[in-house]
């Protein structure tokens, strides 16, 4: 037999049996056995293969595929720096709990330290950022032991899948699956050159691991004036729906009858306790409240970890067992303040003479329809969506909130669209800033033979730099002589020309044209650019706060 080819075929077969539906492949020589096996699986309709040149963008494409489809995704690459380029995506997948499998080919381990070409100590490279690091070891040329080797390879692959999906931990995340491969790296002439020893009957995985039930009920008395802060990964809590809730855009939409609370209304209220769902990261008033030692915090999460930046959490669990009844006057007061904050934002946006990222976010939010998927950039766009009162009912909202970097967002959006379209008919809209777009512009490179989103519109709010810094301490007017260069980083990139280089449909429009443009029938991938101003952002946000 051809050991490397046989091993690769077994691994790919077992990944598919374990639920992998999409694999991103980056070209290389050492991973050729995996590439041939993946191509065969793609041709037979067992997986969908996506070939990319850049491993960094490939990793984020896989993240998007995983979150869009709700299934583990795999990215395969050759040895050396190809593996290192997965670092940012692995870190994001770790903190966002995305089931990402890094399937790396390696040189035979005896070549480590010898000066062999394209060889590095890649096993264990990702350290604490992965749920597990698993190696198969070199495939032996021992046909008489094929049944034993088959069992070993399939068993290890199932361990990879269980770790990635958190089947025994309730803590999904990235896994590094490293496979050293010895030549020959290409299949022998068929029919006798390579075989695929069988897996379990009826397509079952070799080792089935049922999902763990992670349940820690926590008793909470609602008679105290309570607010709910719902962040990324909040989960669904129907028995808390009547409470005033500041929900970040990526939190699941509340069932009908919810009680939304605008984040800017929070400083106008005096809550006596907080129920924190998931991991909130967006709003400074929220951070200040969570850090108040006079306000008890109850943290409810869907996994074993819970956020507690200020060390102020009084108790943790996975769901609330409620006692007591909320004070009606408190609920009325919160609803009143929510209406006041929403009106203040709307009025100040209408009065502001220049188009800003907030205006672009408001236009996008108003143009969405039930069944859509929305992908938000991790800098201002996700915050702007929250501030303009995005209604997430009927939407799927995604954003890389694990470590909240802007890198890989274009690729994440493309992956999310491809993943979502597997089982849904809705379109995908992405709202990102210009720096985010430029940073991952190579993500637009989709080869002519590769799957392309059925309907993805990327809206680029282009204020020629980092608008978020206008709102931070670095944007204080006393730093005006240097802040634009070292924080704003203007670039003057021609977004249209960049899109044309990648053969991506694009046009520049005004913000008032955006709703109609988003409503146009169409297919494929396109970019809509809206020019925006960042120099007046500080003034606009100050006006909104003053109106409160």
Curated annotation (Swiss-Prot):
One annotated GO molecular function: 2-succinyl-5-enolpyruvyl-6-hydroxy-3-cyclohexene-1-carboxylic-acid synthase activity
Cofactor detail note: Binds 1 thiamine pyrophosphate per subunit.
Pathway: Quinol/quinone metabolism; 1,4-dihydroxy-2-naphthoate biosynthesis; 1,4-dihydroxy-2-naphthoate from chorismate: step 2/7; Quinol/quinone metabolism; menaquinone biosynthesis
Disulfide bonds: none
UniProt xrefs under InterPro entries: MenaQ_synth_MenD, THDP-binding, Thiamin_PyroP_enz_TPP-bd_dom
Gene3D superfamilies documented for this protein: 3.40.50.970, TPP-binding domain
Cofactor dependence: Mg(2+); Mn(2+); thiamine diphosphate
CDD domains according to UniProt: TPP_PYR_MenD (cd07037), TPP_SHCHC_synthase (cd02009)
Catalytic activity: isochorismate + 2-oxoglutarate + H(+) = 5-enolpyruvoyl-6-hydroxy-2-succinyl-cyclohex-3-ene-1-carboxylate + CO2
EC top class named in words: transferase
Residues spanning the membrane: none
Superkingdom of origin organism: Bacteria
Record bears the keyword Magnesium: yes
Enzyme Commission (EC) number: 2.2.1.9
Family assignment from sequence similarity: Belongs to the TPP enzyme family. MenD subfamily.
Function comment: Catalyzes the thiamine diphosphate-dependent decarboxylation of 2-oxoglutarate and the subsequent addition of the resulting succinic semialdehyde-thiamine pyrophosphate anion to isochorismate to yield 2-succinyl-5-enolpyruvyl-6-hydroxy-3-cyclohexene-1-carboxylate (SEPHCHC).
Protein name (Swiss-Prot/TrEMBL): 2-succinyl-5-enolpyruvyl-6-hydroxy-3-cyclohexene-1-carboxylate synthase
Organism, as annotated: Mycobacterium marinum (strain ATCC BAA-535 / M)
